[in-house]
Curated annotation (Swiss-Prot):
Database matches in SUPFAM superfamilies: Class II aaRS and biotin synthetases, Nucleic acid-binding proteins
Keywords: Aminoacyl-tRNA synthetase, ATP-binding, Cytoplasm, Ligase, Magnesium, Metal-binding, Nucleotide-binding, Protein biosynthesis
Subcellular localization: Cytoplasm
Originating species: Thermotoga sp. (strain RQ2)
One of the GO BP terms on file: lysyl-tRNA aminoacylation
Gene this protein is translated from: lysS
Gene3D superfamilies in the record: Bira Bifunctional Protein, Domain 2, Nucleic acid-binding proteins
Assembly notes: Homodimer.
Pfam family, one: tRNA_anti-codon
Full protein name: Lysine--tRNA ligase
Primary localisation category: cytoplasm
Residues that, per the record, bind Mg(2+) 1: 398, 405
Amino acid sequence: MLKEFKEQRLNEIQELRSMGIEPYPYKFEKELTAREIREKYDYLQAGEVLESEKLSFAGRVMSIRHHGKTAFFHMKDDTGRIQAYVRADSVGKEKMDLFKRHVKIGDFIGVRGFPFKSKTGELTIYVQEYTLLSKALRPLPEKWHGIKDKEIIYRQRYLELIVSDEAIERFRKRFKAVQVIREFLNSRGFIEVETPILHYVTGGAEARPFVTHLNVFDIDMYLRIAPELYLKRLIIGGFEKIYEIGKNFRNEGISYKHSPEFTSIEIYQAYADYNDMMDLTEELIVEVVKRTCGTLKISYQGKEIDFTPPWKRVRMRDFLKEKLGVDILEDPDEVLLKKLEEYGVELEIKNRAHLIDKLRDLVEEELVNPTFIIDHPVVISPLAKRHREDPRLTERFELIIFGREIANAFSELNDPVDQYQRFLEQAKMREEGDEEAHMMDLDFVRALEYGMPPTGGLGIGLDRLFMFITDSPTIRDVIPFPIVKPKKFEEEEAEFEGGFEE
């Protein structure tokens, strides 16, 4: 059982220290990764030995096969696995006995030696010396039932990363995508900036916020639901091409495509409009997909998504009229509500903005390939500039992929009088019970009164984008440490005990 296993490992540690061996030394000079070793020496033929080439490697022991005075074992680092071979006449009898007694699956060790290929053709390190680097006190999941419970994976992601090369590659792809985004924008003259996480008032999106309390001023504050209004303040202050990658927080439900804590990027460009931001969105995502997946046609959950540009652009009014037979500009609320009732949609709040939002949700599911839905009504776009050809609409787009909103962008509203009136309308909606409506932000209106140039703004939900490039069915699969319902530590330990096998 787990308790006995840990006691045995603790006894081994005590024994090592009594021998003058520190089981947790400070460093090891690792020269090559597993991938670099494979790339450098894969040309060797089966049975070929390259004793003149010395190398050092370190990683976690994933398996061991003892054969008398020799042992084969696999080690893993963050680039993959490599086999190693140790024998008594190479490291000495004392060190071989120490290896057999004290090097276990899950431990970290460093090895020095030379490469060769086994008779079966597997690239292997011939160990001439080794150093124990870290003793593991717990068995790896491969020693019990594996990881079948997704909740355990989400609570203890490190376990999945230890035993699953696929998980390592999934998150490597996520982290690489972030690098690609930064390289793409930096090469175009954008500057990465930072704005506050703690807000005095919420803004930039329609969502229920997390509330916290700042003791030093004895005031309530909010975790940001979006960085938009602070980024626009930077544009007002004189920056022209900026972006921010960071966490946002919305105190709402959890689903396969929603997380209360999520990562987004927001991008703002002075003297640009929503057409420019559409082009930028398309070019940016194409670059990310191409460099992380190697192709623009990817498989997602058994279906093909084609990211090849140019992407389709559809006006929201035309799209809903074609699919549902309603006119979101001309039809009264009663007609829109009746259409929703036909589809069995129930609404707690029945203002026009919510009616249009729910109608949109009904039809976006069928959009698989990237599609821009453009020109939203003013009532659902309080921060977007009115359309230059129809003041009932705004210059706004949403990017839909596989039925999910991935990006949202505007020609930004820079008329302070119009913005103030929109805030008043949002405040009225809050008074009527809409907790997701925007709060009045008088300081932002004041900032606009100093003048903001014509500006294009864009926000992309990165977690959802990363779901596509990693073929992950749920958003929690691409968030390293997602929010899950907590369990007591003792309960989690009992679950482990239940699956443990000696």
